[in-house]
């Protein structure tokens, strides 16, 4: 399988005509934001980013030297000793400072009567708005919106937070400027820090509960893992949803579109 993956990488690099990566990003950094998973989809992205097949070959050989490396289907998941899984690093054409975002964000007291203080985004409304203002079709609007969510969840400018598992937030909450002046801000920031600190361990442990092409990710056991990994310090009952959105927006799901959620790929799952 390793040989096939290397051949695929060579072909892809030839097609793109680029063998030089960005000077400030190593291959390991790049793969880390792809879930430390080397396979068909990430090879395409690595080639587009200018990472050469020699570096990919060397990384796979390094992984071959440890029993911790996971091989599943056409994928290789590098061990934590070589690569730590980070939240997906993606960038959307929709920016949090764009006028469409501002127009579809509530006032900070817009949901006060319901007990929620914060600036909440009308996500479906935003997807409809950018189709009009930018001439995008539904699939392009969905792609950029999911990337927008993943990007800003990663930076901490968005959250989907409540400490009550029986309560659903009004929407994604913007946490910039005056919108960050909310009673739960310290708890939100702590939950974000815990999520990112434990991201590698949570993704790797949960993958054992998810069969690629059949199951959903994260699994129903994810929040139990969060409780154990954070020793009960996490207060966000919806961390599982944040992680799902981050991985979908980061391209860790195959076949996502405006009408289809798609299915997870490694490192989120294992093939039978």
Language model: regions and residue ranges:
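Short acidic, hydrophobic short linear motifs in intrinsically disordered regions
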Residues: 34-48, 115-131, 219
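Bacterial N-terminal signal peptides
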Residues: 6-15
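Short, amphipathic alpha-helical interaction segments positioned at domain boundaries
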Residues: 83-115, 175-203
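A short, conserved structural fragment
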Residues: 64-75, 154-162
């Amino acid at each position: 399988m390793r040989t096939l993956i290397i051949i695929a990488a060579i072909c892809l690099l030839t097609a793109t005509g680029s063998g030089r990566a960005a000077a400030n990003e190593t291959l390991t950094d790049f793969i880390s934001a792809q879930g430390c998973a080397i396979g068909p989809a990430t090879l395409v992205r690595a080639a587009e980013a200018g990472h050469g097949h020699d570096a990919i070959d060397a990384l796979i050989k390094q992984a071959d030297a440890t029993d911790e490396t996971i091989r599943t289907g056409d994928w290789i998941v590098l061990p934590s000793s070589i690569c730590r899984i980070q939240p997906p690093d993606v960038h959307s054409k929709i920016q949090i400072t764009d006028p469409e975002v501002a127009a579809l964000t509530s006032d900070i007291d817009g949901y006060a009567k319901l007990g929620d203080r914060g600036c909440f985004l009308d996500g479906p409304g935003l997807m409809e708005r950018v189709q009009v203002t930018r001439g995008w079709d539904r699939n392009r609007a969905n792609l950029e919106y999911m990337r927008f969510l993943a990007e800003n969840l990663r930076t901490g400018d968005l959250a989907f937070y409540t400490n009550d598992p029986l309560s659903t937030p009004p929407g994604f909450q913007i946490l910039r400027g005056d919108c960050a002046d909310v009673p739960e801000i310290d708890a939100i920031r702590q939950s974000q820090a815990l999520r990112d600190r434990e991201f590698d361990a949570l993704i790797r442990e949960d993958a054992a509960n998810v069969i690629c092409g059949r199951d959903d990710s994260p699994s129903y056991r994810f929040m139990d893992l969060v409780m154990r990994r954070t020793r009960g310090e996490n207060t966000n009952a919806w961390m599982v949803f944040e992680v799902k959105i981050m991985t979908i927006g980061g391209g860790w799901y195959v076949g996502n579109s405006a009408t289809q959620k798609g299915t997870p790929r490694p490192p989120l799952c294992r093939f039978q």
